[in-house]
Amino acid sequence: MQNYLIYFATLILGVAIFYVFNALGSQTVMLKVSSNTAELIGLMNEAMSVVSVFVSIVLGFLVVYASTFLMKRRKKEFGIYLTLGMGKTQVAKILVIETLLIGVISLVIGLLLGIGISQGMSVVTANLFEADMTNFRFMVSTSAIIKTIIYFAIMYVIVMALDVIIVSRAKLINLLYAGAKAQKNHAKNPVVCVLVFIIAAILLGTAYYKVTAGVRTISDFQGLGIQIAKGIIGTFLVFWSVSGMLLAIVKRCRRFYYKGINSFSVKELGSRINTTVFSGGIICLLLFFTICILSSAMAIRNSMNHVLETCTPVDVQFSKLYSYDAAEDYDMTGHNVEENLKACDIDTSKLTDVTEMILYAPEDINIGDFFGKAFAESGSEDYFKEASMETMHIGEYNAFVSSFGGTTIDLAEDEYVILCNYGEMEPRYNAGLAEGQTVTIKGKTYHPKYSTCVDGIVHISNSESNAGVLLVPDSVDMSDCDFWYDIYSANYNTTDQTEVDALNEYYSDANFYKLQEAKTEAVLGEDGSYYSMNCETSKRLRDNSVGLTAMIVFIGIYLGVVFLISGAAILSLKELSEAADSKEKYRILRRIGVDEKKIRHSLLAQSGVFFAMPLLLAIVHSVFGMQTAMFILTAFGRGGLLGSILLAAAVILVIYGIYFMITYICSRKIISE
């Protein structure tokens, strides 16, 4: 019965989670969102459907594993049924009825729990998509219920079939004496265990180094795959070696080893670890994936919020990118962005706080000129030594930031500033700025105003992607420099949400390019090759960002929780199995006078270490894995990782802790029988 409690609880949680994430599609229908957001929600729902197939496979393996595991524990019971005259067909019928009852009850309870949780998920979804919930009501997704029933019904049918096969093929003698066949536990040579542990440490250590300090040396997926393989092999070797090392090390601590029943506890723990090398490694990896997936998903959400606040400060921005031909010979007179917009009959009467910035591409100022000596001498910066540095006048930048209340910059006549928020480029610039790197423009030398980059933008964006802009005094003559960008920024002159929505729709991609098509020559020049125009709104950038963020967050939570439940359930079943196998040992302890308090303390210590081992190794993996995740997440912004890790840790400790407590209580009952 104790074994089935874990099995039953896992089924209920599996059903609830499966329903919750498959009900998102029905819940988002009620949210009042823009057309662009609606498309992103549709894409998210399609992604969730694909992920649900993978989740169903994971849960299917878990259910089949748990059922097969429990069947092995009941072989003696079935042997007794056969001895009393029941046929294998009758025993098979009992199993089918049991599975049906467990399946129906777990489905009903799981769906009720899932429906309740999904109402809270609706609020989370609305918050992620910044949606209007005025039309929200209590929602039950019929499609999600049907999908959940179908998927889990398939799992239960497979379980029934396997149970019947096991009973029908088993011999009576094997069933009756199944309980007497203890799992063989061969003693391991401590010296071999130490050598294997050293090999595991080398594999893990080199993998940790490669994915952190040496991450830039990994150039392809094959290189990354090698490090992942080393981590997986090292994990299994740690579990194989620890069981033999544990007993050898503790035996040397004689005062501890011979105190109370510590010798019994240590041997029992070593036996458990020794028989769970494979499952312990799998559980550790599942917990590692859980920690990284949950932390990364939540970190992306926090980072995106920060990025959207700082990188979309104006409502709309028109950008004109010049071709190389235009940069050399195009006459800007009368052809700035505002003139182009008028020529295309694009209405700008609703715009205010208008600013216009020109970005130049001087031939004699290159990006690599601003890197420090360490970067410049590394030989890996050749591309940047030839790439032109985008340059603009400080006055135009100050006018732009003043339009949304940003911080302006004062430059002396011999100073410059580098504007950058892209994580990959900042260290390069900062190295040069810290060294006081100078730049010469038309014979005059300019010094850096600050020893680090200024965090700022000129293009609105949904990521920190400004790879560097050189800000120079207005007195610098750029008339003979190549044009690169002409950027026209503005806010809407209304705060009425209906009017704002209409303006966002008017300046959307489809409408903007449709208006341009009617005036192609006026926009692109006589030969159509001088430049291209682009329009971007903060609303569209936020929608795209929020849609991607929501998809990552939901998929991350979905997979993370499923992996966590799977790992905890497997560990719990193994622990209960070990407790059942050790009942006679605890009975002997009672007979020789060991009090119940010491027995319970021994069981608690064994269970605690048994649960803690895969979690602790998973945490060590995650310390290095999350550093790699931080490197990858620079594309989504920075910040919020600590809070995300703490939140993920809380979720893991709650679910993992619940499984641990249930397992300990059930194990205590088993050894007391």
Predicted regions: what they are:
Residues 1, 170-185, 580-581, 669-673:
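Short cytosolic juxtamembrane segments of multi-pass membrane proteins
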Residues 1-15, 184-193, 197-198, 240-287:
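N-terminal Sec/SRP start-transfer signal
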Residues 2-9, 20-54, 69-72, 214-233, ...:
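Peri-transmembrane interface segments
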Residues 4-11, 95-113, 149, 153, ...:
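Selective transmembrane-helix segments that form parts of the transport pathway or gating/packing helices
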Residues 16-30, 65-69, 102-131, 144-169, ...:
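Small-residue-rich transmembrane alpha-helices
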Residues 63-76, 166, 246-258, 565-592, ...:
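Juxtamembrane interface at the cytosolic side of transmembrane helices
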Residues 308-550:
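Nucleotide-cofactor and metal-assisted catalytic machinery
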